[in-house]
Amino acid sequence: MATDRYREHKALNPFFDVVMKGLKGLVEGEHYYDAIADDAQFEFLYRFPGWPAVIRGRENLIAAYSGYGNNIVLEKGDRLGVHHDKERGVVTLEYQVHGKAVKTGAAYDNRFVSIVTIKNRKIVRWRDYMDSLAAWQALTGK
């Protein structure tokens, strides 16, 4: 459930909601950003011009996502699958998000697999895989 504290990131609310549903009972924090450890590491195993392969730190992640709504506005997150390895503290989330690319008006439908490591009820590592072709087609209209 998204809160007003992060209203400038409202274009991502369906993402926040679907992943927090998948992490329910495993992390502390009402909002996705609140569930992230200050020194967490995020790895993005896809490449887009200007997007880093690794982001270190909660505040850096928040800053990186600050312009998301200029490019894509999400409308829905669904198809959630959750696989939890309790011994290792690792959760694999499979989900989809749907929305619209702002500049092209193209539909944006994407599938993700996120491998999340949790320690002390906070996200400490996030490895993200997605269908980069779906994103590229929505953003370029091609």
What are these regions (language model features)?
Residues 9, 30-89:
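A solvent-exposed, acidic/Ser-Thr-rich amphipathic alpha-helical stretch
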